[in-house]
Amino acid sequence: MNLTDYVKTVSIEDFGWKFKHQALWNKRLRTTGGRFFPKDGHLDFNPKLYEEHGLETFRKIVRHELCHYHLYFQGKGCKHGDRDFKDLLARVDGLRYAPKMRNQAENYFLYQCQSCGHTYRRKRRVNTQKFGCGLCQGKLIFLNQS
């Protein structure tokens, strides 16, 4: 699929306005579906979201980025909090947030108290030499990373 041609098609069909710049795939994007660059007007899109969620969801992501694009060049509010942006996004049925990707699941560090057996899940590592169990002040041992 030629991405720029696809974005031009979505722009004409869903907005009635022309897309005059370039659309590119960007493999480095991790948590976002796409980005708009006001300096030169091009759009970047996350190819992993297209592969994982399909064309229907990807089209909604394209609509979201095109809302930024068209509002910026019309001189209207193009940021997420602006009323113009919210109204246009609702009108074209674009996604407000990018869907979570499969490999973006939360990772936790698991620790267990040697004395009472209480288990702790933490997003950040815990220094087991310095910190102990909050219930019995026993020694914590690292179990694994989930």
Swiss-Prot record:
Q: Which cofactor does it need?
A: Zn(2+)
What GO MF terms are annotated? zinc ion binding
What GO terms fall under cellular component here?
cytoplasm
Q: Record's HAMAP family?
A: SprT_like
Q: Which family does it belong to?
A: Belongs to the SprT family.
Subcellular localization, as worded in the UniProt entry: Cytoplasm
- Biological processes annotated in GO: response to stress
Q: Indicate whether NADP appears among the record's keywords.
A: no
Q: Which UniProt keywords apply?
A: Cytoplasm, Metal-binding, Zinc
Q: Where does Zn(2+) bind?
A: H64, H68
Q: How is the cofactor bound?
A: Binds 1 zinc ion.
Q: Where is the active site?
A: E65
Q: Where is the SprT-like domain?
A: 6-141
Among the Pfam families in the record, one is SprT-like
Q: How is this protein named in the record?
A: Protein SprT-like
